[in-house]
């Protein structure tokens, strides 16, 4: 079990694009059939459709929830009855590549600690409003509560401690029309049986279950480039997102 950043390998590699060099940090995880899901949701299942020893080729069929992936995005239809006709195919290229700002709230005084991992469970407007100036200049905001480390060690989720946005926080973020993407390291952006953030942020791509956010260098948190490319499944209420942070070095 990993509980400190020092023991973790850096989830990134250096690449060159034109005359610039970037550290690219992978904010995704491979999907395992044993992934811990939202309490009450079914886990992924695999069926062997064709076995290579019998047919000469291998082919598997999977039964997956729209929201099993780390990370995943939410379609407009997921928790908004007025938009139930809009599936995950609704997001175009404007949601895929954006300048980004990350606020790291894992060290907040209100953060709780469990199994050596500190995370903030309730994100409020007061945690965000000091960043209003930079939020007005980026296309994506990423909220790190510290729960990314919980996701990475695949521990069961408890509804009482899953991080979420308070109503005043989601209302605050909704006031920035330039923001196309709102990302968080929680498996949901709303508290249980509430849909406020999904309604107030209905015109944005909500990306949940981001991982490895702690690998984004401190000096880059105020401005980096973010890829959040949704795998556009027609009619789905959500789906996997290929998410990478690009930090110029």
Q: What is the role of each PLM region?
A:
Residues 1-249:
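Active-/binding-site microenvironments in catalytic and ligand-binding cores
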């Amino acid at each position: 079990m990993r509980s400190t950043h020092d023991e973790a390998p850096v989830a990134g590699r250096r690449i060159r694009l034109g005359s610039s060099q970037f550290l690219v940090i992978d904010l995704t995880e491979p999907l395992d059939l044993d992934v811990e899901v939202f309490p009450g949701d079914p886990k992924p299942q695999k069926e062997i459709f064709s076995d290579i020893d019998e047919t000469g080729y291998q082919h598997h069929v999977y039964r997956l929830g729209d929201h099993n992936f780390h990370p995943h995005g939410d379609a407009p239809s997921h928790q908004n009855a007025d938009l139930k006709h809009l599936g995950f195919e609704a997001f175009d290229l404007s949601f895929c590549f954006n300048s980004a700002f990350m606020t790291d709230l894992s060290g907040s005084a209100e953060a709780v600690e469990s199994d050596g991992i500190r995370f903030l469970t309730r994100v409020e407007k007061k945690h965000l409003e000091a960043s209003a100036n930079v939020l007005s200049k980026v296309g994506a905001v990423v909220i790190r509560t510290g729960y990314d480390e919980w996701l990475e060690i695949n521990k069961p989720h408890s509804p009482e401690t899953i991080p979420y946005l308070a109503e005043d926080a989601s209302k605050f973020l909704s006031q920035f029309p330039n923001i196309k993407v709102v990302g968080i390291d929680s498996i949901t952006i709303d508290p249980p049986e509430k849909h406020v953030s999904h309604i107030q942020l209905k015109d944005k791509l909500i990306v949940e279950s981001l991982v490895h956010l702690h690998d984004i260098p401190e000096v880059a948190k105020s401005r980096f480039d973010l890829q959040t490319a949704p795998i556009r499944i027609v009619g789905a209420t959500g789906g996997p997102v290929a998410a990478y942070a690009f930090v110029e070095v």
